[in-house]
């Protein structure tokens, strides 16, 4: 039962990361000044 909780936690974390990636891409497309540095780093991450 404990293993299931770990799997659920990992799935939730992965979903959040994917969501963040989507938001980052949107911000980068709009060329928001605050995100420009993060976008430069984000280019190297597929």
Swiss-Prot record:
Disulfide bonds: none annotated. It is found in: Cell inner membrane. One of its GO terms (cellular component) is plasma membrane. Pfam families: MgrB (PF13998). May form homooligomers. Probably interacts with the periplasmic domain of PhoQ. It is a single-pass membrane protein. It comes from Escherichia coli O6:K15:H31 (strain 536 / UPEC). This is PhoP/PhoQ regulator MgrB. Keywords: Cell inner membrane, Cell membrane, Membrane, Transmembrane, Transmembrane helix. The gene is mgrB. The keyword Magnesium does not apply.
């Amino acid at each position: 039962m404990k293993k299931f909780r770990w799997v659920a936690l990992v799935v939730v974390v992965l979903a959040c990361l994917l969501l963040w990636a989507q938001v980052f891409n949107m911000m980068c497309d709009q060329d928001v000044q605050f995100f420009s540095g993060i976008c430069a780093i984000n280019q190297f991450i597929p």
